[in-house]
Amino acid sequence: MMPTPVILLKEGTDSSQGIPQLVSNISACQVIAEAVRTTLGPRGMDKLIVDGRGKATISNDGATILKLLDVVHPAAKTLVDIAKSQDAEVGDGTTSVTLLAAEFLKQVKPYVEEGLHPQIIIRAFRTATQLAVNKIKEIAVTVKKADKVEQRKLLEKCAMTALSSKLISQQKAFFAKMVVDAVMMLDDLLQLKMIGIKKVQGGALEDSQLVAGVAFKKTFSYAGFEMQPKKYHNPKVALLNVELELKAEKDNAEIRVHTVEDYQAIVDAEWNILYDKLEKIHHSGAKVVLSKLPIGDVATQYFADRDMFCAGRVPEEDLKRTMMACGGSIQTSVNALSADVLGRCQVFEETQIGGERYNFFTGCPKAKTCTFILRGGAEQFMEETERSLHDAIMIVRRAIKNDSVVAGGGAIEMELSKYLRDYSRTIPGKQQLLIGAYAKALEIIPRQLCDNAGFDATNILNKLRARHAQGGTWYGVDINNEDIADNFEAFVWEPAMVRINALTAASEAACLIVSVDETIKNPRSTVDAPAAAGRGRGRGRPH
């Protein structure tokens, strides 16, 4: 008699286990790597991605591309997550980390198919990663922070390496200098929020500028603003979160009046409340008034008559950056506008940039903030420029905090590959094969750099292996001359932190995917999702 089958899972649940599902997961990760493979390095190509709403994005950044791809495969999502975490943590190396993770999996795939236990693979990978990280720390070159000129040179080289694979690589020297200037203006915490990036269409890339202070787009203004002065020297700046306009009552207010005089008294009281606020602001000595909330036409004309400048509906982020630069604090009431709460700057002016008008605060006493104003043609191009600058800024921040650098262009990967290959020959058993596979996987970076530039990858990798075997630690791919070169001498530098982070994240992701022995897909997530989406809409009561 047949035993009754026990049904644990809901009908329609898709469950796959054993070696076939693990191989399937590894193959899914290869597909993700294929999507970003060609974007690596200075000769990398760009991707044009159009989302569901028809918005086009041109990008070369691994994390941006993977975010825009709607990945549904659960194992492949792991690679998307490590690219995002690399972007958040160090800013650059997002394509490298995805390629490394996929290549690690590709190298262990034959061992998995032969039935090697995943735990043996994981143990070997953890050993190899630890050895590789220690080796990077050992050979990384430290630049002394005391020597400001040397440190600045190092930071510019790191920024140029980060920008060399981007759309704006032709202007990398121009932007690298701007990026280093920007990060140097920040305080010791190096808060990214304190660097504003504003995009103005039109003009050439070289028209982009860095403002040592705050700049933001002119807000919507009411009639009367054209009478206000557009430039002040040493003004006091009032930063408010107060509405300065007459408005209908927000709540259900009810006023009962019996005579015309009663009504007039109410109207007068409303006007008096507004004028009282305006007078207090005027008497505080402030010449520039910024508010997060609207400043109406009456207030605009009142300030114009008294040679004051005002701007309402200023974005909160810009208001906070103005406060950080000019000092003072944001007030929610006008009753205590003393000198302590007002900000100051040397020059405030409103300037035309392209087709837009911008408000500039420069010469700020606490200038721990700055603003990039980017110029350029197409909107997508400027968005990609912003992403490229973000990567370069993150790299420079990392280089300031961790002042050790390694050579890029596949040099560090080749050195680690040689080191791990040599190490693997000293140990017996399966670990030897697996650490050898890890070492081979590291060669994907220089190989892909060659492929993307159209070089003969096999030939160049043979030269690199030979040179590293002779002790040429920093030899990597020379993109300009289709050969190998000492990339440290060529100033292809990047913070050691970027490589350490990429290796550990890629190795962890590979271990995570190898350690999964069963994939269970719940049917609810696929069947019920579209139905649930329409549920929240009100359909009105049937009459």
UniProtKB/Swiss-Prot annotation:
Xref: InterPro entries: Chap_CCT_eta, Chaperone_TCP-1, Chaperonin_TCP-1_CS, Cpn60/GroEL/TCP-1, GroEL-like_apical_dom_sf, GROEL-like_equatorial_sf, TCP-1-like_intermed_sf, TCP-1_chaperonin
Catalyzed reaction equations? ATP + H2O = ADP + phosphate + H(+)
Gene3D superfamilies noted in UniProt: GroEL (3.50.7.10), GroEL-like equatorial domain (1.10.560.10), TCP-1-like chaperonin intermediate domain (3.30.260.10)
Location comes to: Cytoplasm
Keyword check for Ubl conjugation:
yes
Binding residues annotated for ATP, in chain numbering: 41, 93, 96, 398, 409, 499
- Could you say which protein family the record assigns here? Belongs to the TCP-1 chaperonin family.
What assembly does the database describe for this protein? Component of the chaperonin-containing T-complex (TRiC), a hexadecamer composed of two identical back-to-back stacked rings enclosing a protein folding chamber. Each ring is made up of eight different subunits: TCP1/CCT1, CCT2, CCT3, CCT4, CCT5, CCT6A/CCT6, CCT7, CCT8. Interacts with PACRG. Interacts with DLEC1.
Its biological purpose is as follows: Component of the chaperonin-containing T-complex (TRiC), a molecular chaperone complex that assists the folding of actin, tubulin and other proteins upon ATP hydrolysis. The TRiC complex mediates the folding of WRAP53/TCAB1, thereby regulating telomere maintenance.
- Name under which the protein is recorded: T-complex protein 1 subunit eta
Species name: Pongo abelii
